[in-house]
UniProtKB/Swiss-Prot annotation:
NCBIfam families cross-referenced by the UniProt entry: yfcH
Lineage start: Bacteria, Bacillati, Bacillota, Bacilli, Bacillales
SUPFAM superfamilies with a match to the protein in the record: NAD(P)-binding Rossmann-fold domains
Species the sequence originates in: Staphylococcus epidermidis (strain ATCC 35984 / DSM 28319 / BCRC 17069 / CCUG 31568 / BM 3577 / RP62A)
Family, similarity comment: Belongs to the NAD(P)-dependent epimerase/dehydratase family. SDR39U1 subfamily.
Name by which UniProt lists this protein: Epimerase family protein SERP0438
Superkingdom of origin: Bacteria
Pfam families (UniProt xref): DUF1731, Epimerase
């Protein structure tokens, strides 16, 4: 039986992941910030905001660290601090948990983001690309991965999952992207040429578990579908799937003014390819954006 420790296990990605893992021979310990009672024999919740929580954690084989304040909220100075500290502090806390334990985890899967890569209209980024931080979001990613890599001191295999734009039917980015189309004001954002490197939630969960279970999976992995789309075509495809028009245009200056720094998520994007997943033989269920949207959207 595999023993999992998961942070962020009650969020969108975490909930899908827990639902998949509990169907296997496993026990799941989920760290939360509030008291929660489990009604499933394979799941235990621990409130890690309480003193002495560390003593409740059993020996662990696999750590999955998904904790972090949402990016889908206006980036005030206080929220930017929360975005950074929530990720770094949770990772450091996990490191300190195992630092004094004899039993070390075999694998750490640490969430990350494609914000590691600089915005570019022409470059196709693979995991071979290396860079230093160049803006606030890349600084978060850089520090998050740096703290996660400390687990290598334990002999733990560390996987850094650089998530793409996650498409799910229960919240997240797709819900926000659908709203303007439901209001008949969907269309091009900025130049419309910026890349959206997306991934269906089912493929994301499968990709996470694939890297955890594959002994040769280590280091950064781009968890994005093989065929990214430029925003204008992405929006057009979304509109067709929803049977709505794609006719308006929101200029970059307007988006910057309304959204502030958060606008970087939709304007300053990257074309990211999952080369390492392909090299290890992973097969995507949803390569094509229209197929992914047809599966998720309830018109």
């Amino acid at each position: 039986m595999k023993r999992y420790l998961i942070t962020g296990g009650t969020g969108m990605v975490g909930s899908h992941l827990v639902n998949e893992i509990k169907q296997t021979d496993a026990h799941i310990t989920i760290l939360t910030r509030q008291d929660k009672t489990s009604n499933h024999p394979k799941i235990t919740y621990i409130n890690w905001s309480k003193e002495g929580w560390q003593h409740q954690v059993p020996d662990i084989d696999i750590v999955i660290n998904l904790a972090g304040a949402t990016l889908n909220k206006r980036w005030t100075s206080s929220h930017k601090q929360a975005m950074m500290l929530s990720r770094i502090q949770s990772t450091q806390t996990l490191f300190e948990l195992f630092e004094t334990r004899e039993h070390k985890p075999e694998v750490l899967f640490n969430a990350s983001a494609m914000g590691y890569y600089p915005p570019d209209l022409f470059t196709s980024y693979t995991e071979l690309y290396r860079t230093l931080p160049f803006d606030f979001l890349s600084e978060i990613v850089y520090q998050w991965e740096r703290f996660a890599n400390k687990f290598k001191q334990f002999g733990t295999r560390v996987v850094l999952g650089r998530f793409g734009l996650i498409l799910s039917d229960d919240g997240g980015a797709l819900e926000m992207m659908e709203l303007p189309y439901r209001l008949y004001v969907g269309g091009k954002l900025g130049s419309g040429r910026q890349w959206y490197s997306w991934i269906h939630i089912d493929d994301l969960i499968r990709g996470i578990l694939f890297t955890i279970n594959h002994d040769n999976a280590e280091g950064p992995f781009n968890l994005t579908a093989p065929i990214p789309e430029r925003q204008n075509l992405f929006g057009y495809t979304l509109a067709r799937a929803m049977h709505k028009p794609h006719e308006t245009w929101a200029p970059k200056l307007i988006l910057r003014a309304v959204l502030g720094q958060m606008s970087t998520v939709i304007l300053d994007t990257q074309k990211v390819l999952p080369n390492k997943l392909h090299a290890l033989g992973f097969e995507f269920k949803y390569n094509n954006l229209r197929n992914a949207l047809d599966d998720l959207i309830k018109a």
